């Protein structure tokens, strides 16, 4: 891999430590990326251990060839939202000792202008995680109604000026369609009312479009629920999120399954029966990167790690 597109895995030591790896365990890296977390997991596994990686990016599948000679490693080309399906097909449901999920966009994806994720590098307005299928960001911007764009920008980007930006995009595309990342980023910078320091005005809109195009929040929801179904008793879940939408989903998921089902007052249900509906327990507090890690890798700044453990029943 070129130095230009090198990738530093975020919270690497903390995330793998959260898995509490057993030498002969079976683990899932649901977001392989360029293999940083997988490499660290393999270091902790014995010869009878097993690691199954998942990624929908064809470039990630290519990068996985670095582990081709390691019999403990295999990779599935697909979205992490379908991890439960892949595990069931392998006959391993309820036998997984740990699931690792990193919801960040990898540095090679961001830095490769041709992928269309970056507002700092000009390239085709694509943004697909799997660029072999699906609608591009340019295609969507060409057809989306103002109301739909405004909803996406506000819901997935928490953009306060969502309607204003959507109207300006709709007006400008009548003259020239948006085909390049720089065209969109320049428009947003020109019309933006944002006063956020150290943040490009297009940050939230680009995030929102990327999340929408790739159905990221739906994938996250499916992955979390899927992890719960495949984990063995005492199996661990280590999850890294990068913005508040993702982190809220993870936090609420762990809390919901740690508290168990709510029961209407007065029903003749025992505490033991309620406890059976508690499927997870949180492990420690949320972990954020150290100042030293942020200095090495500024993209780690917004990351948050949460760890949970599958209960016995």
UniProtKB/Swiss-Prot annotation:
Keyword rRNA processing: yes
InterPro entries cross-referenced by the UniProt entry: RsmH, SAM-dep_MeTrfase_MraW_recog, SAM-dependent_MTases_sf
Subcellular location: Cytoplasm
Keyword Nucleus: no
Organism domain of life: Bacteria
Protein known as: Ribosomal RNA small subunit methyltransferase H
Catalytic activity: cytidine(1402) in 16S rRNA + S-adenosyl-L-methionine = N(4)-methylcytidine(1402) in 16S rRNA + S-adenosyl-L-homocysteine + H(+)
GO terms of biological process kind: rRNA base methylation
Coiled-coil stretches noted in the UniProt entry, renumbered to this chain: none
Similarity comment: family membership: Belongs to the methyltransferase superfamily. RsmH family.
GO molecular function per UniProt: rRNA (cytosine-N4-)-methyltransferase activity
Organism lineage: Bacteria, Pseudomonadati, Pseudomonadota, Gammaproteobacteria, Alteromonadales
GO CC aspect terms: cytoplasm
Listed Gene3D superfamilies: Putative methyltransferase TM0872, insert domain, Vaccinia Virus protein VP39
Residues at which S-adenosyl-L-methionine binds: 35-37, 55, 80, 102, 109
Described purpose of this protein according to its UniProt entry: Specifically methylates the N4 position of cytidine in position 1402 (C1402) of 16S rRNA.
Keywords: Cytoplasm, Methyltransferase, rRNA processing, S-adenosyl-L-methionine, Transferase
Protein EC: 2.1.1.199
């Amino acid at each position: 891999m070129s130095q230009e597109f090198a990738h530093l895995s975020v919270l690497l030591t903390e995330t793998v430590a959260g898995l509490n790896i057993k030498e002969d365990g079976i683990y899932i890296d649901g977001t392989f990326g360029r293999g940083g977390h997988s490499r660290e997991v393999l270091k902790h596994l014995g010869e009878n251990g097993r690691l199954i990686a998942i990624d929908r990016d064809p470039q990630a599948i290519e990068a996985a060839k670095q582990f081709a000679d390691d019999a403990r490693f295999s990779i599935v080309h697909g979205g992490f939202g379908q991890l439960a399906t892949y595990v069931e097909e392998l006959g391993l449901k309820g036998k997984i000792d740990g699931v690792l999920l990193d919801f960040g966009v990898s540095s090679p994806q961001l830095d490769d202008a041709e992928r269309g994720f970056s507002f700092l590098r000009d390239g085709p307005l694509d943004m697909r995680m799997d660029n072999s299928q699906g609608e591009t960001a340019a295609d969507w911007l060409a057809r989306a109604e103002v109301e739909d764009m405004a909803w996406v920008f506000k819901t997935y980007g928490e953009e306060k000026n969502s309607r204003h930006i959507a109207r300006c995009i709709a007006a400008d595309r009548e003259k020239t369609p948006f085909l390049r990342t720089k065209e969109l980023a320049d428009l947003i910078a020109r019309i933006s009312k944002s006063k956020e320091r150290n943040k490009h005005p297009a940050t939230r809109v680009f995030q929102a479009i990327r999340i929408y195009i790739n159905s990221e929040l739906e994938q996250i929801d499916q992955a979390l629920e899927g992890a719960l179904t495949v984990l063995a008793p005492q199996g661990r879940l280590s999850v890294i999120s990068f913005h508040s939408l993702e982190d809220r989903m993870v936090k609420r998921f762990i809390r919901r399954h740690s508290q168990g089902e709510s029961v209407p007052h007065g029903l003749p249900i025992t505490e033991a029966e309620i406890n059976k509906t508690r499927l997870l327990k949180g492990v420690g507090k949320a972990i954020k990167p150290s100042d030293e890690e942020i200095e090495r890798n500024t993209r780690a700044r917004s990351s948050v790690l949460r760890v949970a453990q599958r209960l016995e029943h």
